[in-house]
């Protein structure tokens, strides 16, 4: 399980050093093989261990290519998916196309989200956090039953 937000610098080649606390788990779970793709709703990337991505691919393969909405999701997620292998120094190369899509510059945030990571431009991440907090503070809708059962 991946949790927490970590500031990371991309090097000049677009590589990020995976935090040490995740490296052993990623090697154990997927031999350091990862898949990076776009997020459909936010200006960030999604980074999955290969074993977790294969579950997503199975679900995507069951969607109908004849349904326009389902085909769009397949096209966007699979069409942008890029395999990346953690090197001996624990770094992952994020392709230029994906970096450009998410507006990634030197400072990025690696955000654990259970079975995957989100990869954000640092400034964009902090802006999103502010917006999310403001939305929660001003929310007028009744929380879903699942949120009502969540006790923090």
Curated annotation (Swiss-Prot):
PROSITE patterns, A to Z: SPOVT_ABRB
Gene Ontology, cellular component aspect: cytoplasm; nucleoid
Major subcellular location class: cytoplasm
Entry keyword annotation includes Transferase: no
Compartments, as annotated in UniProt: Cytoplasm, Nucleoid
Alphabetically ordered keywords of this record: Cytoplasm, DNA-binding, Repeat, Repressor, Transcription, Transcription regulation
A GO molecular-function descriptor: DNA-binding transcription factor activity
GO biological process: negative regulation of DNA-templated transcription initiation
Pfam family membership, one: MraZ
Function recorded in the entry: Negatively regulates its own expression and that of the subsequent genes in the proximal part of the division and cell wall (dcw) gene cluster. Acts by binding directly to DNA. May also regulate the expression of genes outside the dcw cluster.
Subunit relationships: Forms oligomers.
HAMAP family in UniProt: MraZ
Entry-linked NCBIfam families: division/cell wall cluster transcriptional repressor MraZ
Entry similarity comment: Belongs to the MraZ family.
Protein name (database record): Transcriptional regulator MraZ
Taxonomic source organism: Edwardsiella ictaluri (strain 93-146)
Gene encoding the protein: mraZ
């Amino acid at each position: 399980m991946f949790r927490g937000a970590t500031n990371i610098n991309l090097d000049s080649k677009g590589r990020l050093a995976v935090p040490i606390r995740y490296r052993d788990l990623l090697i154990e779970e997927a031999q350091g093989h990862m898949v990076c793709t776009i997020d459909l709703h936010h200006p960030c990337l999604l980074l999955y261990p290969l074993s977790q991505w294969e579950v997503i691919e199975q679900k995507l393969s069951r969607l109908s290519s004849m349904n326009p909405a389902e085909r769009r999701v397949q096209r966007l997620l699979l069409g942008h998916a890029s395999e990346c292998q953690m090197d001996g120094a624990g770094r992952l190369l994020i392709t230029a196309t994906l970096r450009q899509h998410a507006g990634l510059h030197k400072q990025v945030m690696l955000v654990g989200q259970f079975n995957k990571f989100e990869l954000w431009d640092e400034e964009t991440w902090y802006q999103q956090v502010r917006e999310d907090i403001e939305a929660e503070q001003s929310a007028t809708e009744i929380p879903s039953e699942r949120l009502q059962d969540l006790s923090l």
